[in-house]
Every structure is written in C-alpha cells, then in structure tokens.
Design a protein with these regions (language model features):
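Non-catalytic helical/linker scaffolds that mediate oligomerization, partner binding
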Residues: 1-306, 313
Length: 319
C-alpha cells in the first residue's frame, strides 16, 4: 500500500512460493489504483518448483542467490540461475541477477577475478540487469562497486554477440504484436537499421522486441512517465518521453523530430518504427515502417509514382 501511495515503479515480493502470492499482491496494487509492476524474488525451493506458474502472473523475476543458496544445494544454484534467465527471456519478462555479485568489495576496493566473471556470465546468459546489495547498502566502497560493475558490463557487452547464450527454443509466435516484434528484429538486421523505435503506451511492444535481442538499440517512445521509468529495466531499451496521439502521422512526426533533435541516430541512418491502430491500445502493434532519418531540403513529383530519396551534396567550387 505504501508503494502504491508513493507511485513506485516496481514491487519486489520476497519469499514467493506459489503464484497465489503474486496474485494477492496484484489485488492490493489494483485496489489502490497503482500501475507498479511486480518482481518475484526467486529465493525458495518452492518458487523454483513452481517457476512456470509464477512466471505466468508476474512481470519479472529476481534471482536472489543468497537465500536460494541456503534453501538449495550450492552446486545447484548456477544452473537454476541460467534456467530462470532462459524462461524469463522466452516470455519477454525482465530478469535481475542479484546477491553477492561483488561481495568482496564490501571490504576491499577491488573485486576478485571470480566475481568479475560472475557478473560477465550473468550478462552473457541474457540477464536484463545485475544488482548490487550489501556492496552499496553497507560496504566501504559503494561508489567504486557501481563503477566496477559498470566497467565489467560495458566490456562484456562489447563482445557479447560472440558468446551470448540463446534460449534453447522460443515459444511459437501466436499473437500479431509478437509476430510483428519478431519481424521488426529481422527487418532491422536486413536494412542495417540504427534503431528499432516502438511507439508504446504500456511498454509491451518494447518488451516483446527485447525478447528477440535485436542487434541495434530499441528507442521506445512513450507518453507515460511510469512506462518510461519501468522500461529502464528492460534489456536493450532506451526509453524516451514522446507525445503519442491517436493520429499515426502526427505521432510519427513527433518521434522523428525527437530523434533528430536529440541526435539519437546519425543523419542518413535507417530506423524501424513499430506502431499499431488504434494507437495507445496495448497489444495493437501491427505495423512496421522503415524510415531514413534525413533533413528534407526539397520536394518534387516522382515520375515513377513512388517515394524516392537521395543524398544531397554541397559543391564548394565549380570543379
């Protein structure tokens, strides 16, 4: 209730054992009119046994390895971590890996090599986020811990395409929005797009695209401040506040203007825009547009009855 009153973005539920635990929390949030997403902290044997059922009703998961290692055998925890990450990726739901990531930095200014590898492997496995706890809550080197983890993540992501694990299988595409998200990933690759740009109110489209791990950034345009904050947790997504109306042309114009103004891609780059009709309705995504970002300096009539574009060159001399 406190979280609902203070407009929090996520509620992490501890010691989840079954899906009914999540349903009860959601009832409380809905009764309070809150839009917060629910993260299930996977830290009990029962939660692992009921993984699929819990995943159906939750918005994301956290692999809380500290308590999980107490309830289960130590040697089982690494594979459970990988299994939870994979299941979350298959459902397009964010997953956080937490606890003892850089534990030695509670006392020391540098992590062990094993801890560095632990962070890197969570990134390679496909986690949406890695989280510090004791290192920043009560450690001697909180700022250094954040800086160190950031460096490990950035370095790992430079070569992550070479080593990242792909899910053994993705679920069959059965919804229009999901199929469009899958297609957007492929189209972006074919046209060498600089970004995929979903127009989304709830954030659902951005999460669906993220599930397929495109090779370019996902610049999510949303009019909702809460959605903007929530999407900051999702893999590969850079959320932006952008006016989205029920008029598709106006919404596209707003998105492109923001991209140009903030220099989010280079002039001449292709972007893949995802939208749907009616705009603003969750799950309505059904269109893909490939647009080249450029400044229009002239317009004319095409004799071939289709849109044509070209690169304008400025001559500094007659030669």
């Amino acid at each position: 209730k406190w979280g609902a009153e203070n407009n929090v973005d996520y509620v992490a539920v501890s010691f989840v054992r079954r899906k009914e635990d999540i349903i009860e929390v959601r009832r409380v949030l809905e009764a309070a009119g809150a839009s917060a997403k629910i993260i299930a902290k996977m830290e009990t044997r029962q939660s692992v046994d009921n993984l699929d059922a819990i995943l159906e009703v939750v918005d994301g998961m956290m692999v809380a390895r500290g308590d999980l290692g107490v309830e289960m055998r130590t040697e089982d925890v690494p594979m459970i971590q990988k299994e939870i990450i994979e299941r979350c990726r298959m459902q397009g739901k964010p997953v956080i890996v937490a606890t003892q990531m850089l534990d030695s930095m509670i006392r020391n200014p540098r992590p062990t090599r094993a801890e560095s590898s632990d962070v890197a492997n969570a990134v390679i496995d496909g986690a949406d986020a890695v989280m510090l706890s004791g290192e920043t809550a009560g450690g001697k080197y909180p700022v250094e811990s954040v800086e160190t983890m950031n460096r490990i993540i950035v370095r790992t992501e430079q070569d992550v395409a070479l080593w990242c694990r792909k899910p053994r299988s993705l679920p069959a595409v059965c919804e229009t929005a999901d199929a469009v998200s899958h297609a957007a990933r492929d189209v972006a690759k074919e046209v060498a797009a600089a970004a995929i740009v979903p127009l989304t109110s709830s954030g659902m489209t951005a999460r669906m695209v993220s599930k397929y791990r495109p090779t370019c950034p996902i610049i999510a345009m949303t009019p909702s401040l809460s959605t903007w904050r929530q999407l900051s947790l999702v893999w590969g997504v850079m959320p932006c506040i952008c006016p989205i109306t029920h008029q598709l042309e106006e919404s596209l114009k707003n998105a492109i203007s923001l991209i140009k103004r903030e220099s989010l891609v280079a002039n001449g780059d292709n972007i893949v825009i995802m939208s749907g009709m009616p705009l603003g309705e969750p799950g309505s995504t059904n269109m893909i547009n490939v647009i080249r970002i450029a400044n229009v300096i002239a317009r004319g009539l095409s004799l071939v009855r289709r849109r044509v574009t070209g690169v304008a060159c400025k001559a500094s001399s007659p030669q």
